[in-house]
């Protein structure tokens, strides 16, 4: 769905583990890394699109994750001119995204990059929370910064809680 301003409706997905790290995935056959994301189909809610994309891109089902929060509004980025397909109608000049922060509830082996048979990614890893802001392609950087800042209040307490639990486990009686 492309709106009247030329922005395609899209969902972005940040999956975190119990340590507050986030899943970072490498685009298939490329050297670029990003969070899972994908378009919202006609008649589909943002949450429905998120669950569909979650399965298509990383093989996770609703029972594998818990929604922690989502962005208050849609965030936009413009595509570089070289990526705009002028011959498509309507012309898409960028994406408007609703972002979701999910916590992985299942074991990591539930992640399957080839679940749909058409992989978007060929590798993934856990990275520190702020790492993606510095590493994503430049035209997505502002949106990533805004999303990570908005979600920090939800995610960073996970890191503190787990760190405290590890310290308690290391104490000798």
Swiss-Prot record:
Paired cysteines (S-S): none
GO terms for biological process, alphabetical: mRNA catabolic process
Origin superkingdom: Bacteria
Enzyme Commission designation: 3.6.1.-
GO cellular component: cytoplasm
UniProt KW keywords: Hydrolase
SUPFAM superfamilies assigned to the protein according to its UniProt record, in alphabetical order: Nudix (SSF55811)
Motif mapping: Nudix box: 38-59
Any Pfam family hit: NUDIX
HAMAP family: Nudix_RppH (MF_00298)
Family stated for the protein in its record: Belongs to the Nudix hydrolase family. RppH subfamily.
PANTHER family: M7GPPPN-MRNA HYDROLASE
Protein name: RNA pyrophosphohydrolase
